[in-house]
Amino acid sequence: MDFTLSADDRLLQQSVRDFIEQQGNSGWQEIERTDTLPKALIEGARDVGLLGLSIPQEYGGLGLSVVQKTLCHEMLGRGPWGLASFISVHTGIGCVGIVRFGNAAQKQRYLPKMATGEWIGSFALTEPQSGSDAAGLQTRAERKGDGYVLNGHKTFITNAPRAHHFVTFARTSAGISAFIVDADSPGVSIGQVFNTTGHRGSQISEVVFEDARIPAEALIGEEGKGMDYAKRCLSEGRTTLSARCVGTGQKALELAVEYAEQRKTFGKPLIEHQALAFRLAQMSARTEAARLVVYRSAWILDQGGQAIRESSTAKYLAAEGAWQTVDDALQIFGGYGYIQGEYMIDRLWRDLRVARVYDGSSEVQQIVIAGRLRKGDVETAWG
């Protein structure tokens, strides 16, 4: 078993890390203050190729494997999560459905402009009464004439205020179906824009469909297959989100070690106090363990597997582990860690907290894992 990255993958990883450290983390206080991603930062992400991670090369993207995308997302986790979420939704769950299940006309219309950032994508699944229970969604799409009429209400939709279109899920006569809904379609509007504790700049809001008319060609794949498509998008999305958690945990660990080497108490550096040294060791162990599980999930997806249990395991371990690691880092910084905008730890703490909630809460991940075990998905097949 060889864990060595290829030269190309190391270059990819380093280019994203350099972008995050030089552009993302250098201006994070401004993002926190304005709750806006600077245009130059989005353009920088485009120039590195981050807006086209999932888009095939023939449409102007990078066409990366899931493992390669996971490398990128781990590096994104080192920076502001508002930027990471913007990129993740645009080129991840807001894009993968079109890439994998869209027809040739849909790909030709949307993907080239998504790769350049001219059009920003979003993913509209969550509703006020159906978050983790996505299959309980109430938005309906009624077939009328040569198209559909949508009625419903989506919430917590990342990128919605800036989106050109939404990969949207609604009930049809055949079951839950997926559609590409342009934001300027008649009857589509943006509702409340949320003021979030972390993820500053990501723009999260409600999306309202009131007799919204869309053409028949907006349907992705077949009617009634929407949840199958959503699950595939979410398995990959949970894997790359888990990678961001690992990246955040790694960044917190590095900051904590640096601080513990410099800060002195009782005549010696913090890191020489055994209690603090053990805490740092635990932070490192959690991060390394989660990283292995995350990349295992990514590898399974690249082999054509569904990775349902594996992606949920990665999400659960990475989110919970990174949260504990970031909280431990804040504890090491003491009072300075709780001062907003001082040492970056407070931003990591606020950004990371929601990872235990969205894309399926930690409780839901345990339900998914247990459900797979009941179905006989017990063995860890390395072959």
Q: Each predicted region: which residue ranges?
A:
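A short, Trp-centered hydrophobic/proline-enriched beta-strand micro-motif
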Residues: 117-125
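Flexible, small-/acidic-enriched active-site or ligand-binding loops
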Residues: 136, 184-215
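Short Ser/Thr-interspersed hydrophobic loop/turn segments at strand-loop and sheet-helix junctions
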Residues: 49, 72-77, 170-173, 181-186, ...
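Short glycine/proline-enriched turns and hinge-like loops at secondary-structure junctions
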Residues: 64-65, 133-135, 159-163, 200-202, ...
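A short core secondary-structure module
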Residues: 147, 151-193
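Alpha-helical interface subdomain recognition
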Residues: 1-83, 89, 101-106, 113-118, ...
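Short Gly/Pro-enriched turn/cap motifs at secondary-structure boundaries
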Residues: 114, 129-132, 156-159, 171, ...
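Long, acidic (Asp/Glu-rich), low-complexity accessory segments flanking structured domains
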Residues: 210-229
